[in-house]
Amino acid sequence: GCGWGGFAELAAREFGAQITGITLSKEQLAYAKARIEQQGLSQQAQFHLIDYRDVSGQYDHIVSIEMFEAVGEEHWPTYFNQVKRLLKPGSSALLQIITIANERFDSYRKSADFIQKYIFPGGMLPSHEALEREFDNAQLRFEDSFYFGKDYARTLAQWRHAFLAQWPRIQAQGFDERFRRMWLYYLCY
């Protein structure tokens, strides 16, 4: 999914890219469209409310940022086959995927942890080895990987700080102390 349109805005503004963004969220769709319009980039970016499995056409590049974790392990082959089908010959995909250590994957996938139970129900992190298998099965070439776990820890810390700063506004929307504790735990996880 295109999320809130941040990457689409960056790619359109900085690189002149023509963007097709997809999402299942009406709220994200409205926000992304407004964001792009506000930046004067509407001619470069279009957004659609559609499931990735229903997208047609072919693209020069595909970017997927932390969406894969939400598709569920049973849909991993579908995801990679769709990426392959949507790529023009000779084109590329950049996939930002949160992974779990190879040695922890088998035990992790057998029972839900805190994040799977309370934050991202149905979510499943792949291991690096599991990703390589899925790439191979879809006949996609896995070229490179980059790990930035320490950067993500800083991101979570910044999100926690922002969450606490905005708590009065969040609470005013009807969210209770249990919700606050749950998200603080996640952001310190």
Where are these regions (language model features)?
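A short acidic, Gly/Pro-enriched loop at the edge of an enzyme's catalytic core
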Residues: 53-62
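Conserved beta-strand signature within the Rossmann-like core of class I S-adenosyl-L-methionine
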Residues: 90-98
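A short glycine-rich, Lys/Arg-flanked "PGG" loop and its adjoining helix->strand segment in the class I
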Residues: 77-89
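Substrate-binding/catalytic lobe of Class I Rossmann-like enzymes that use SAM or dcSAM, i.e.
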Residues: 99-189
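Conserved SAM-binding strand-loop segment of SAM-dependent methyltransferases
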Residues: 39-52
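Conserved SAM-binding motif I beta-strand of class I
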Residues: 18-23
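Conserved SAM-binding loop
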Residues: 32-33
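Conserved SAM-binding loop of SAM-dependent methyltransferases across substrates and taxa
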Residues: 6-15
